[in-house]
Amino acid sequence: MKKWLFLAFAAAFSLSVQAQELTENKEYVVVEGQQRSAQPEVIEFFSFYCPHCYSFEAQYHIPQKIAESLPEGTSFKQYHVDFLGPQSENLTRAWALALAINAEEKVKIPLFKAAQTNALKSMDDIRQIFIDNGVSAEQFDGGINSFAVNGLVTKQQNLVKKYQVRGVPDFYVNGKYRVNMEGLAHDENHFIDEYVQTVKGLLQK
Protein backbone atom coordinates (compact mmCIF):
# COMPACT_ATOMS: atom_id res chain seq x y z
CA MET A 1 0.00 0.00 0.00
CA LYS A 2 2.80 2.40 0.93
CA LYS A 3 4.64 1.54 -2.28
CA TRP A 4 1.51 2.22 -4.36
CA LEU A 5 0.99 5.59 -2.66
CA PHE A 6 4.63 6.50 -3.27
CA LEU A 7 4.39 5.62 -6.96
CA ALA A 8 1.17 7.63 -7.34
CA PHE A 9 2.75 10.62 -5.62
CA ALA A 10 5.89 10.32 -7.74
CA ALA A 11 3.86 10.25 -10.94
CA ALA A 12 1.87 13.33 -9.91
CA PHE A 13 5.05 15.13 -8.87
CA SER A 14 6.69 14.25 -12.18
CA LEU A 15 3.80 15.79 -14.16
CA SER A 16 3.95 18.91 -12.01
CA VAL A 17 7.68 19.29 -12.55
CA GLN A 18 7.29 18.82 -16.30
CA ALA A 19 4.81 21.70 -16.46
CA GLN A 20 7.05 23.94 -14.35
CA GLU A 21 10.21 23.18 -16.30
CA LEU A 22 8.88 24.27 -19.68
CA THR A 23 10.75 27.37 -20.77
CA GLU A 24 9.27 30.07 -22.96
CA ASN A 25 11.12 30.43 -26.28
CA LYS A 26 12.68 27.02 -25.77
CA GLU A 27 10.03 24.28 -25.74
CA TYR A 28 7.25 26.70 -26.59
CA VAL A 29 6.47 30.26 -27.64
CA VAL A 30 3.54 32.43 -26.60
CA VAL A 31 1.32 33.38 -29.52
CA GLU A 32 1.11 37.16 -29.54
CA GLY A 33 -2.29 38.77 -29.30
CA GLN A 34 -4.18 35.55 -28.53
CA GLN A 35 -6.28 34.79 -25.48
CA ARG A 36 -6.44 31.41 -23.81
CA SER A 37 -9.21 29.27 -25.29
CA ALA A 38 -12.36 28.80 -23.23
CA GLN A 39 -11.95 25.02 -23.32
CA PRO A 40 -8.71 23.00 -23.31
CA GLU A 41 -7.69 22.20 -26.87
CA VAL A 42 -4.81 21.10 -29.06
CA ILE A 43 -4.70 22.00 -32.75
CA GLU A 44 -2.28 20.62 -35.31
CA PHE A 45 -1.83 22.35 -38.64
CA PHE A 46 -0.48 20.07 -41.35
CA SER A 47 -0.26 19.53 -45.09
CA PHE A 48 -0.50 16.28 -47.01
CA TYR A 49 2.40 17.59 -49.10
CA CYS A 50 4.64 18.08 -46.05
CA PRO A 51 7.13 15.20 -45.61
CA HIS A 52 7.65 16.03 -41.94
CA CYS A 53 3.89 15.91 -41.36
CA TYR A 54 3.84 12.49 -43.00
CA SER A 55 6.66 11.31 -40.73
CA PHE A 56 4.87 12.72 -37.67
CA GLU A 57 1.76 10.77 -38.64
CA ALA A 58 2.96 7.50 -40.14
CA GLN A 59 6.41 6.95 -38.64
CA TYR A 60 6.53 8.67 -35.25
CA HIS A 61 2.76 8.63 -34.53
CA ILE A 62 3.08 11.91 -32.63
CA PRO A 63 -0.51 13.10 -33.25
CA GLN A 64 -1.84 9.73 -32.10
CA LYS A 65 0.35 9.74 -28.98
CA ILE A 66 -0.77 13.26 -28.13
CA ALA A 67 -4.44 12.41 -28.64
CA GLU A 68 -4.14 9.31 -26.45
CA SER A 69 -2.44 11.25 -23.63
CA LEU A 70 -4.87 14.17 -23.40
CA PRO A 71 -6.94 14.69 -20.25
CA GLU A 72 -10.66 14.07 -20.48
CA GLY A 73 -12.49 17.02 -21.96
CA THR A 74 -9.57 18.20 -24.11
CA SER A 75 -10.23 18.41 -27.83
CA PHE A 76 -7.66 17.54 -30.49
CA LYS A 77 -8.15 18.80 -34.04
CA GLN A 78 -6.05 18.48 -37.17
CA TYR A 79 -6.49 21.21 -39.78
CA HIS A 80 -5.03 21.35 -43.27
CA VAL A 81 -3.16 24.36 -44.70
CA ASP A 82 -3.56 25.31 -48.32
CA PHE A 83 -0.25 27.03 -48.99
CA LEU A 84 1.76 23.92 -49.96
CA GLY A 85 1.44 21.91 -53.17
CA PRO A 86 -0.60 22.21 -56.37
CA GLN A 87 -3.72 20.51 -54.98
CA SER A 88 -3.53 22.03 -51.50
CA GLU A 89 -6.81 23.95 -51.75
CA ASN A 90 -8.64 20.86 -52.98
CA LEU A 91 -7.04 18.86 -50.16
CA THR A 92 -8.19 21.40 -47.57
CA ARG A 93 -11.72 20.99 -48.90
CA ALA A 94 -11.41 17.20 -49.01
CA TRP A 95 -10.11 17.16 -45.43
CA ALA A 96 -13.08 19.30 -44.40
CA LEU A 97 -15.33 16.62 -45.89
CA ALA A 98 -13.42 13.91 -44.02
CA LEU A 99 -13.95 15.85 -40.77
CA ALA A 100 -17.63 16.34 -41.51
CA ILE A 101 -18.33 12.64 -42.14
CA ASN A 102 -15.82 11.24 -39.60
CA ALA A 103 -13.72 9.63 -42.32
CA GLU A 104 -10.36 11.04 -41.22
CA GLU A 105 -8.77 7.71 -40.35
CA LYS A 106 -10.01 6.13 -43.58
CA VAL A 107 -8.41 8.64 -45.93
CA LYS A 108 -5.57 10.31 -44.03
CA ILE A 109 -2.69 7.96 -44.87
CA PRO A 110 -3.85 7.29 -48.46
CA LEU A 111 -3.99 11.05 -49.08
CA PHE A 112 -0.54 11.48 -47.57
CA LYS A 113 0.87 8.74 -49.79
CA ALA A 114 -0.70 10.19 -52.93
CA ALA A 115 0.42 13.75 -52.20
CA GLN A 116 3.94 12.65 -51.32
CA THR A 117 4.29 10.93 -54.70
CA ASN A 118 2.66 13.79 -56.65
CA ALA A 119 -0.12 11.46 -57.74
CA LEU A 120 -2.87 14.05 -57.25
CA LYS A 121 -3.65 16.02 -60.39
CA SER A 122 -7.23 17.07 -59.70
CA MET A 123 -10.17 16.72 -57.33
CA ASP A 124 -11.13 13.61 -59.31
CA ASP A 125 -7.97 11.87 -58.03
CA ILE A 126 -8.83 12.87 -54.47
CA ARG A 127 -12.40 11.68 -54.96
CA GLN A 128 -11.16 8.27 -56.09
CA ILE A 129 -9.06 7.91 -52.94
CA PHE A 130 -12.13 8.54 -50.81
CA ILE A 131 -14.12 5.96 -52.79
CA ASP A 132 -11.29 3.41 -52.62
CA ASN A 133 -11.22 3.78 -48.85
CA GLY A 134 -14.84 3.35 -47.91
CA VAL A 135 -16.55 6.64 -48.70
CA SER A 136 -19.35 6.23 -51.23
CA ALA A 137 -19.45 8.30 -54.40
CA GLU A 138 -22.79 9.67 -53.22
CA GLN A 139 -21.29 10.77 -49.91
CA PHE A 140 -18.38 12.49 -51.62
CA ASP A 141 -20.37 14.18 -54.37
CA GLY A 142 -23.15 15.26 -52.04
CA GLY A 143 -20.80 16.58 -49.39
CA ILE A 144 -17.77 18.12 -51.05
CA ASN A 145 -19.49 21.47 -51.72
CA SER A 146 -22.04 21.30 -48.92
CA PHE A 147 -22.74 24.09 -46.45
CA ALA A 148 -21.05 22.16 -43.64
CA VAL A 149 -17.90 21.53 -45.67
CA ASN A 150 -17.77 25.14 -46.86
CA GLY A 151 -17.88 26.18 -43.21
CA LEU A 152 -15.03 23.85 -42.28
CA VAL A 153 -12.93 25.09 -45.20
CA THR A 154 -13.41 28.66 -44.00
CA LYS A 155 -12.65 27.66 -40.41
CA GLN A 156 -9.35 26.05 -41.39
CA GLN A 157 -8.31 29.05 -43.47
CA ASN A 158 -9.30 31.53 -40.77
CA LEU A 159 -7.35 29.67 -38.09
CA VAL A 160 -4.25 29.58 -40.29
CA LYS A 161 -4.52 33.37 -40.59
CA LYS A 162 -5.32 33.83 -36.91
CA TYR A 163 -2.21 31.99 -35.75
CA GLN A 164 -0.11 33.21 -38.70
CA VAL A 165 0.94 29.67 -39.52
CA ARG A 166 3.97 29.71 -41.80
CA GLY A 167 5.22 26.14 -41.56
CA VAL A 168 3.98 22.68 -40.71
CA PRO A 169 3.62 20.54 -38.70
CA ASP A 170 2.62 23.16 -36.13
CA PHE A 171 0.90 22.45 -32.79
CA TYR A 172 -1.02 25.02 -30.74
CA VAL A 173 -2.22 24.49 -27.18
CA ASN A 174 -5.16 26.32 -25.62
CA GLY A 175 -5.02 28.96 -28.34
CA LYS A 176 -2.07 30.65 -26.66
CA TYR A 177 1.01 28.46 -26.91
CA ARG A 178 2.88 27.02 -29.90
CA VAL A 179 5.21 24.06 -29.51
CA ASN A 180 8.71 25.10 -30.60
CA MET A 181 10.10 22.06 -32.38
CA GLU A 182 13.60 23.56 -32.59
CA GLY A 183 13.83 23.68 -28.81
CA LEU A 184 13.23 19.96 -28.30
CA ALA A 185 15.65 17.03 -28.24
CA HIS A 186 17.17 16.06 -31.58
CA ASP A 187 17.41 12.29 -31.17
CA GLU A 188 14.27 10.48 -32.29
CA ASN A 189 13.12 8.75 -29.10
CA HIS A 190 13.61 11.75 -26.82
CA PHE A 191 12.11 14.10 -29.42
CA ILE A 192 8.85 12.15 -29.58
CA ASP A 193 8.55 11.96 -25.80
CA GLU A 194 9.43 15.63 -25.32
CA TYR A 195 6.88 16.68 -27.92
CA VAL A 196 4.09 14.80 -26.17
CA GLN A 197 5.17 15.96 -22.71
CA THR A 198 5.43 19.57 -23.87
CA VAL A 199 1.84 19.51 -25.10
CA LYS A 200 0.69 17.94 -21.83
CA GLY A 201 2.66 20.49 -19.83
CA LEU A 202 1.25 23.43 -21.76
CA LEU A 203 -2.27 22.20 -21.06
CA GLN A 204 -1.49 22.67 -17.36
CA LYS A 205 -0.30 26.27 -17.71
Predicted regions and their residues:
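Sec/Tat signal peptide C-region and signal peptidase I cleavage site
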Residues: F13-E21
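C-terminal cap of thioredoxin/glutaredoxin-like
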Residues: N133-K205
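A short beta-strand-turn-helix
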Residues: E24-V42
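Structural cue for short, hydrophobic secondary-structure segments
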Residues: E44-F46
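Extracellular/periplasmic catalytic domains that process cell-envelope and extracellular macromolecules
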Residues: R36, L70-P71, Q87, K162-R166
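Sec-dependent N-terminal signal peptides
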Residues: W4-F13
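Structural alpha/beta surface segment adjacent to cysteine/selenocysteine redox centers
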Residues: F48-R127, T198
